[in-house]
């Protein structure tokens, strides 16, 4: 059954506005009867490329440290309340209801956040970025491990689960359009929370699932799904960022800067201690540390940087027509929504250089052995295989970048192409088949065969 876009938009807005309010919420950093100023932060613990503004930041206590120091200077007691959600929509609902001051969410939800804030006279601002991927690799379409579906074109007439209005939904819409399919007419889109969609995929009530981090990696790691489409094939940036209620930013700019300073410290911690950060997030979320590291590790899919890069703003502008065509937003003034002044002040004179910096240079993968608090990095995927083959009994996880898009993936879940002396990994079977078609003599081989071929002769 086709759901009309207007009905979808209405349902989304209604559900967002009717989210039950949590008891004891703060909002707008109001002072309580005892003079305590409460700052309420909304985050998504399992959307792990927001960890520097959520899960990891909370566990490190950096924001509380900054506010404690501020309180000692100005004689005010500050309290932080953290509220955890599965997606960005309820965070937006709570922000527009005056119950959350600062939130983090993906690019498409950020635009809805901007639109709803303006519509409900509680405008918001995008003030920093958490994690990004310049090609779009943070979103993936997956199918069941034994699914006969081999490409996006095979989704015609099929049931596809996603969270409407999310970054993953945006990836699905664009990918289907590139494949020559109408996202509204040619598939049956199921608007579901990520966990519900994962269950639907496993139960067979959904043929495919389009979701954001960490769901695709988690399901692949658990052997419950295989990748059908790598979002990086779109070659369009995707990111998550921090949004703040404008009145809060104006009333308490120093507190907002304390948050951004704390976010910067959490980002530095993640860069300097990637394995420890992955373990910390895993403990807080219940996700396997190996999955967290796939996205957040030294060579992970996400790059963590608080600066608001021009490429990300440009991508956000390209997202507006997609949401507008689905009647989820009207016009959104992205330039007015983006407000870099606070993060600029936190960075000081170093901001311009940091903003201009790109992601780290691509490498060949890494291996995590049991009992180790660091990983081993390699120049090529073949070296990863060779090392993994020699440490089978101690192997915790091996990661390799897709030969075409660079998206990091689990070596034992990748699709391997053997071409003479070369071994090339791919996230999806369709990409591997395209490689074989372009290289006479190349063939797809199982992971075990790839391991054997990588061994020194």
Language-model-detected regions and their locations in the chain:
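Secondary-structure end/capping motifs
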Residues: 48, 252-330
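C-terminal motif of bacterial Sec signal peptides marking the signal peptidase cleavage site
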Residues: 20-24
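Conserved C-terminal helix/tail region of periplasmic/extracytoplasmic solute-binding proteins
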Residues: 324-360
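Bacterial signal peptide processing site
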Residues: 26-29
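Pocket-lining segment of extracytoplasmic ligand-binding domains
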Residues: 189, 195-283, 382, 390-398, ...
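Intrinsically disordered, low-complexity linkers and terminal regions
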Residues: 351-377, 381-457
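A bilobed periplasmic-binding-protein/Venus flytrap-type ligand-binding module shared by bacterial periplasmic
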Residues: 138-148, 238-254, 417-419
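Short, glycine-/small- and polar/acidic-enriched structural segments
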Residues: 33-184, 188-191, 207, 236
């Amino acid at each position: 059954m086709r759901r009309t876009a207007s009905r979808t938009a209405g349902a989304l807005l209604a559900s967002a506005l009717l989210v039950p309010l949590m008891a004891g919420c703060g909002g707008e950093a109001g002072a309580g009867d005892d003079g305590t100023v409460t700052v309420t932060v909304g985050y998504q613990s399992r959307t792990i490329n927001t960890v520097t503004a959520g899960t990891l930041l909370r566990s490190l206590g950096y924001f509380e440290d900054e506010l404690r120091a501020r309180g000692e200077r100005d004689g005010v007691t500050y309290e932080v309340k953290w509220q955890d959600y599965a997606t960005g929509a309820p965070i937006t609902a709570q922000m527009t209801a005056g119950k959350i001051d600062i939130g983090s969410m993906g690019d498409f939800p950020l635009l809805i956040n901007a639109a709803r804030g303006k519509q409900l006279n509680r405008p918001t601002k995008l003030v920093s970025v958490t994690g990004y991927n310049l090609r779009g690799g943070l979103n993936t379409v997956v199918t069941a491990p034994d699914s006969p579906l081999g490409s996006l074109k095979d989704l015609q007439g099929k049931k596809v689960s996603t969270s409407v209005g999310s970054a993953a939904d945006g990836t699905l819409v664009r990918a289907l359009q590139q494949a020559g399919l109408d996202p509204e007419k040619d598939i049956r889109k199921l608007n579901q929370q990520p966990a519900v969609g994962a269950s639907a995929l496993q139960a067979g009530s959904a043929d495919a699932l389009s979701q954001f981090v960490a769901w695709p990696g988690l399901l692949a790691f658990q052997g419950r799904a295989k990748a059908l489409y790598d979002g990086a094939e779109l070659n369009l940036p995707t990111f998550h960022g921090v949004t703040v209620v404008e009145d809060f930013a104006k009333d308490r700019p120093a507190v907002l800067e304390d948050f951004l300073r704390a976010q910067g410290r959490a980002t530095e911690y993640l860069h300097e201690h990637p394995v420890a950060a992955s373990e910390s997030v895993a403990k807080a979320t219940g996700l396997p540390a190996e999955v967290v590291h796939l996205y957040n590790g030294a060579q992970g899919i996400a790059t963590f940087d608080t600066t608001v890069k021009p490429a990300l703003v440009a991508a956000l502008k390209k997202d507006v027509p997609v949401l507008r065509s689905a009647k989820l937003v009207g016009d959104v003034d992205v330039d007015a929504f983006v407000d870099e002044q606070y993060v600029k002040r936190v960075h000081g004179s170093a901001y311009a250089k940091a903003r201009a910096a790109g992601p780290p240079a691509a490498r060949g993968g890494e291996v995590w052995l049991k009992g180790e608090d660091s990983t081993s990095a390699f120049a090529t995927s073949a070296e990863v295989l060779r090392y993994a083959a020699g440490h089978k009994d101690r192997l915790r996880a091996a990661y390799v970048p897709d030969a075409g898009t660079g998206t990091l993936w689990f070596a034992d879940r990748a699709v391997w192409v053997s071409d003479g002396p070369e071994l090339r990994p791919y996230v999806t079977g369709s990409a591997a088949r395209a490689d074989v078609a372009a290289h006479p003599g190349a063939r797809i081989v199982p992971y075990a065969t790839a391991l054997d071929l990588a061994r020194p002769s």
